[in-house]
A protein has these predicted regions:
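N-terminal intrinsically disordered/low-complexity leader segments
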Residues: 1-23, 195
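Helix-turn-helix
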Residues: 27, 31-69, 73
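Hydrophobic alpha-helical connector segments
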Residues: 83-115, 159
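Amphipathic alpha-helical packing segments from all-alpha helical-bundle domains
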Residues: 83, 109-119, 124-158, 184
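Hydrophobic/aromatic-rich alpha-helical bundle segments in the mid-to-C-terminal region
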Residues: 131-132, 136, 148-195
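Short alpha-helical scaffolding segments that buttress acidic/His motifs in well-ordered protein cores
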Residues: 103-104, 118-122, 159, 163-166
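Short, basic, alpha-helical segments at the C-terminal edge of helix-turn-helix-like DNA-binding modules
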Residues: 76-81
Length: 195
């Protein structure tokens, strides 16, 4: 009580505006990924994303001032999912190459649409430098798996390249991926063939 007025301890303002903003931002990112999955990365504009998210174009521009901001956010969402799953593989007590092979194989199953969006956005990074750091993120974690098996940087590079190539191959075919075959290719990539 101060000057006859009872004061309550100040509570942080949690009127939901921040939570609504974060939710709206996430909805716009998910809409961007749906546009990429359906129309390709070239189909992403503030207008197409706004239509997909059922919001105004000005709202997408409010959260993402430039198209690069929108594309980086979309690619970051996919890259975060992949790196989280890769870290789970690294931290588990199971065969990490088997886990990596299963993750690669998922591009031919339930993860196909997401993998296709990631591939398209990563390829776009060749022309849009703002996307490059995010596009490299999953490769760095795959390299960590390689470093658990080999101290030879060529072998680690080969594992990263094999993983990337296998993902592309799966997306280009309708064949059901064989996890054992993928694991064998990944293991083979870690052998340099030189003494």
């Amino acid at each position: 009580v101060e000057h006859g007025v009872t004061r309550r301890k100040a509570e942080p303002v949690t009127d939901g505006r921040r939570a609504r903003g974060a939710r709206r931002r996430a909805e716009i990112i998910e809409a961007t990924l749906r546009v990429v999955q359906r129309d390709g990365a070239g189909g992403v504009t503030h207008r197409t994303v706004a239509r997909e998210a059922d919001v105004t174009t000005s709202l997408t521009a409010y959260y993402f001032a430039t198209l690069d901001d929108l594309l980086v956010a979309a690619l970051s969402t996919v890259a975060d999912e992949y790196t989280r799953r890769l870290h789970e593989i690294i931290e588990s007590d199971t065969d990490d190459l088997e886990g990596l092979a299963a993750l690669v194989a998922s591009a031919g199953g339930e993860g196909r649409r997401r993998a296709l969006a990631e591939r398209e956005l990563s390829t776009m990074a060749a022309r849009r430098p703002a996307l490059r750091p995010v596009a490299r993120r999953w490769r760095e974690v795959v390299a960590q798996i390689g470093e658990r098996h080999s101290t030879d940087p060529r072998a680690v590079d080969a594992l990263v390249a094999a993983t990337d190539g296998l993902c592309a191959d799966i997306l280009l075919t309708d064949a059901r991926p064989d996890v054992r075959r993928i694991r064998a290719v990944l293991a083979h990539s870690l052998r340099t063939g030189e003494d």
